[in-house]
């Protein structure tokens, strides 16, 4: 069994599509109707965006994570995000390097690198 996709309820599909395309390289895979789109990330995973009213507090109940090869890549992402006006926190728990940002609906999204071996 393979985890195939995650669906987010968002207030504006267009704004969320632009965010995930710009910052994480996702491209449109399916766009069947207004208010719904499926984006594909380079490794094949899917992110479905469905327009609606996100549940109160739902943005803080989970996060999305994108792995990059090195901690330098995490720092580069953080610096690029900050240069474009996003708040980007950096953490280093247990040898990980993690940069966290929020999407247009406040969902937490992290870019991380595994601890060096």
What would you call each of these model-derived segments?
Residues 1-14, 64, 115-117:
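N-terminal beta-strand motif that seeds the catalytic metal site of vicinal oxygen chelate
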Residues 1-2, 57-61, 92-93:
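Short glycine-enriched loop/turn motifs at secondary-structure junctions
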Residues 12-27:
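Amphipathic alpha-helical segments
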Residues 26-27, 48, 85-90:
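A short linear hydrophobic-aromatic micro-motif
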Residues 27-60, 108-114:
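Conserved short beta-strand elements that form part of the metal-binding/catalytic scaffold
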Residues 78-79, 83-117:
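Vicinal oxygen chelate
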């Amino acid at each position: 069994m393979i985890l195939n996709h995650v669906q987010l309820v968002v207030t504006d599909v267009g704004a969320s599509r632009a965010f995930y395309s710009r910052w994480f390289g996702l491209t449109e895979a399916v766009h069947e109707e207004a208010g719904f789109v499926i984006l594909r990330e380079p490794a094949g995973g899917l992110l479905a965006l469905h327009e609606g009213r996100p549940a109160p507090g739902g943005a803080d109940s989970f996060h999305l994570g994108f792995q990059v090869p090195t901690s330098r890549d995490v720092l580069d992402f953080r610096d690029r995000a900050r240069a474009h006006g996003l708040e980007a926190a950096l953490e280093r728990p247990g040898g990980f390097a993690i940069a966290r940002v929020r999407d247009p609906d406040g969902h937490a999204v992290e870019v991380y690198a595994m601890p060096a071996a």
